[in-house]
Amino acid sequence: MKTIEVVAGVIRDGEKFFATQRGYGEFKDGWEFPGGKLEPGETPEEALVRELKEELAIDILVKDFICTVEYDYPKFHLTMHCFYCEIQRGTPQLLEHENAKWLSLAELNSVNFLPADVEVVKKIKREF
């Protein structure tokens, strides 16, 4: 089974967390924390800065590491490195996603997160 290595940013603003809804592909309409694939030679932090600039037109500061999720989807294995992030410049623009929401801790279960991201939500809820 093919392994895909990605990064995800849990963007925080006070007690709110930014989630995005996929607008394309096999998992269209599923909710996730934004990010994407690592390119050769990139650190996870560098990939996250690049991906969030490409997807949301924002500059971020990568903060604390949350966890690495290992998840088997039907067609591939996902390794996802997750970090808390803070917006340094810009307002998120949906360049690749169809929707986005700022969610409180209590609202995190109000959207249909993709399975790997559900693991991140559980970790966040344990920390707060």
Regions found by a protein language model. Give the residues of each.
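Conserved N-terminal beta-strand and adjoining loop/helix that marks the start
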Residues: M1-F17, K37
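Conserved hydrophobic "DFG−1" position in protein kinase catalytic cores
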Residues: I11-R12, A19, C85-I87, W102
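Conserved Nudix-box catalytic region and its N-terminal flanking loop in Nudix hydrolases
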Residues: K16-E54
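Hydrophobic packing within well-folded, soluble alpha/beta domains
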Residues: P44-K53, F65, F83, A100, ...
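Short secondary-structure junctions
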Residues: E55-V62
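Active-site-adjacent beta-strand/loop module that shapes the phosphate/pyrophosphate-binding cleft
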Residues: D59, V69-T91, K101
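NUDIX/MutT-family hydrolases
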Residues: Y84, Q93-I124
